[in-house]
Amino acid sequence: ELLSQRIFLHFGAVDHFATVYINGQKCGTHKGGYVSFKVDVSPYVREGENIITVHAVDDIRDRLVARGKQAETYYSEQCVYTRTTGIWQTVWLEFVPKTYIEKVKYYPDIQSGMLTIVAETKGRGEFFAESFFDGRETGSARVFSEGGTTVASIPLKEKHLWRVGEGGLYTLYLHYGEDKVKSYFGLRNIRLDGYRFLINETSVFQRLVLDQGFYPDGIYTAPNDKALLADIERSMAMGFNGARLHEKIFEERFLYYCDQKGYIVWGEFPNWGLDLSYPDCIYGILPEWIEEIERDFNHPALIGWCPFNETWDTGRRKQFDEALSLVYQTTKAIDSTRPCIDTSGLFHVRTDIFDVHDYTQNPEALAENYRDLPKD
């Protein structure tokens, strides 16, 4: 019965170039060591035992391979740490019927109290969506689709805003043919108003930690869900309301807990290792960056994008500004709902927020550096 369905083999992340084989037959490849991908293995599996082989290559000396905070040397040094190669996130199988939901995007509107769902569907069928809050039904929508892009809008009977430090999530059930999905969304928007960062029209001061996502035992891999949640809870207990997810694309389980807790985060890319003085550096970031935006679009806790960190001119070689501008423009084209910082801290090219990295350790001196800034 299972073999009559479409079978997808999912990988949370494999660093860096992955080739997947089923029973000795090549069935898929993926480039990029940080984002999730799936392979349709339906034609390759057989009844009974199957052998899955993954060949991973991770040459971080290649100027087009993004390594983030992974050390180029055998040992950790300065602000780079132990390397990771191969499978470092969860692997699982998904069985789907012939008519199914491939992916969805949620567009909540806090003014109208409306949720618009844009789904990519396979096959013809009826698309039905139903939302709940604290167990109470809060709205539904039903449309027929020929497949492809399917749009449905739910007028919400109750308006519960997602809040920083609190969360507040709606449960969402999606049906398409025989396919059933349980999901969630948060009712929130983001807007810049001069020097103010507004979440649901309330100015929010971001007191963030720099989370680099390394663990003593698993290096890049968290030992369990408790470890992911503990990082968030410890940070909040110390008075922080969020984090820069620094030089690493975090696994979605972490973002799930951020959504629950109301813990705001910035999504980054592990751009260290890319040589930005060459025009072809774009090939080392753009495909995987687009995959990251598409994957994490629905997380309300994710409040902004930052594809590059601390880029600058090196020696006689100037950073290729057009690459930074292109990545910024691509980001805004895919996701106009969030701000984007082109390169955090240094040589900005085109950005929504002009941020500065100041490593002054003396509080009085730090305050003096910015005493002329407008106060809100």
Regions picked out by a protein language model, each given a short descriptive name:
Residues 1-100, 123-126, 249-252, 261-266, ...:
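Accessory beta-strand-rich segments of carbohydrate-active enzymes
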Residues 230-233, 242-376:
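Substrate-binding/catalytic cleft of secreted carbohydrate-active enzymes
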Residues 95-124:
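Surface beta-strand/loop "capping" patches
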Residues 27-28, 138, 204:
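Short hydrophobic beta-strand segments in globular cytosolic domains
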Residues 39-43, 153-166:
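Signal that preferentially marks extracellular ectodomain short beta-strand elements
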Residues 104-106, 172-235, 341:
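N-terminal carbohydrate-binding accessory modules
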Residues 51-54, 166-177:
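Short, aromatic- and glycine-rich surface loops/edge beta-strands on solvent-exposed regions
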Residues 22, 113-144, 150-154, 172:
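Beta-strand-rich binding/interaction modules
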